[in-house]
Amino acid sequence: MFTMKKPLLFLFFLGTISLSFCEEERGADEDDEVEMTEEEKRGLRDKIKNVAIDVAKGAGTGVLKALLCQLDKSC
């Protein structure tokens, strides 16, 4: 019985090592997908920020023109 335990323990040990390597590779693949989504989010955030800045500039210009009109009383 003792002679059977050593090979079984050895096979169990090899199986655990190979399983841990598979999990590490799978984790590395999943990390790449996460980075892509973060890059996409960053790009989307930049686009939204640029649109908001353009809208604010347009609104600010309109408000300044209205104030100038009120101050000059040329309306």
Curated annotation (Swiss-Prot):
Superkingdom: Eukaryota
Signal among keywords: yes
Prosequence residues removed at maturation: 23-40
Disulfide bonds: C69-C75
Gene Ontology terms: biological process: defense response to fungus; defense response to Gram-negative bacterium; defense response to Gram-positive bacterium; hemolysis in another organism
Compartment(s): Secreted
Signal sequence region: 1-22
Tissue occurrence: Expressed by the skin glands.
GO CC entries: extracellular region
UniProt keyword terms in alphabetical order: Amphibian defense peptide, Antibiotic, Antimicrobial, Cleavage on pair of basic residues, Cytolysis, Disulfide bond, Fungicide, Hemolysis, Secreted, Signal
Membership in a protein family: Belongs to the frog skin active peptide (FSAP) family. Brevinin subfamily.
Function: Antimicrobial peptide. Active against some Gram-negative and a variety of Gram-positive bacterial strains. Active against fungus C.glabrata 090902 but not against C.albicans ATCC 10231. Shows hemolytic activity against human erythrocytes.
Protein name: Brevinin-2SN1
